[in-house]
Amino acid sequence: MKPLRAADVRRAVDAAGRAITAALDMRHKPIVSDMLNSAGSVSAEWYIETLWHYLAKRALLAGVSSFDVEFRQPARLADKQIHFSLPHPEADDLVMDFHVMRVPPGAKKSEKVPVARIAIHRGTRRRRHGVAPEPPAHPYGIEVRTRHLNAARQVSWYTLVAVIMDVARRGAQFADDRIDREDDTLLYIVPRFTFTPLVDAALRDNLFVYPEFAMAQRWAKGRTSSTARVTFWAVANAAPWPIAESVVTVVRTSLVNGVRRPVDENGDVVSKSGA
């Protein structure tokens, strides 16, 4: 047996250290019904609330300018547990990866299946895209109560993202000509979105928050997706101010031969290159 060289020992120790660090930086949560959206998968707002919790715990919130969320597979109740890494550096961003463990058909052992990824962009400034419009004079909104707050007594990202997802999907649906055609299996889904928290809205008397919807990219012939922009405003006893902005990709889907697929305005499946 050959004697171990110092370089080999260092490499082995480094590899073991990386493995231990990765294991310590992983967390898991049981998937329960309160975490699910109307489609039966883990909701966008749950991912964002989890992100906020660990950023706040590590005192990293002040350095966050915006983040991108990409959903890769729906995580469902049958998956039982969702696993995720704590925010860690990757290139110029912080990243959180989420996965579940599933047994593939015909296999005996479970395998790791990525379900979501959040890229957190760091910077000292948070700003909106383009010129800020005049605040809309909406007669509706959410009166902020304790249940809408995070641990810092500010309107939570969970509250904002939950409403943003509903408003973006429904607004894009109403803007789609396809909705006028009979299709009981039509469903609008969100594969990715960006979120920019502009300012924190702390609890105060008579505080309301409300969303403003606009189409950033309208439905086009032969395409399966559109883009919505949702701006969240807060108002108390003075002029409204924007507190968050999100750009949301919305995909039109339908059941085709028993499989949910992106479809164009005629209900036909479109290749990825044409989507």
Where are these regions (language model features)?
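Hot-dog-fold acyl-thioester-processing enzymes
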Residues: K2-D68, R72-Q73, E111-R192, A244, ...
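Hydrophobic beta-sheet segments that form the core/acyl-binding groove
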Residues: D68-G106, V190-N237
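Residue-level signal for glycine
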Residues: P105-P114, A238-P242
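Glycine-rich phosphate/pyrophosphate-binding loop shared by adenosine-nucleotide-utilizing enzymes
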Residues: T227, W241-A244
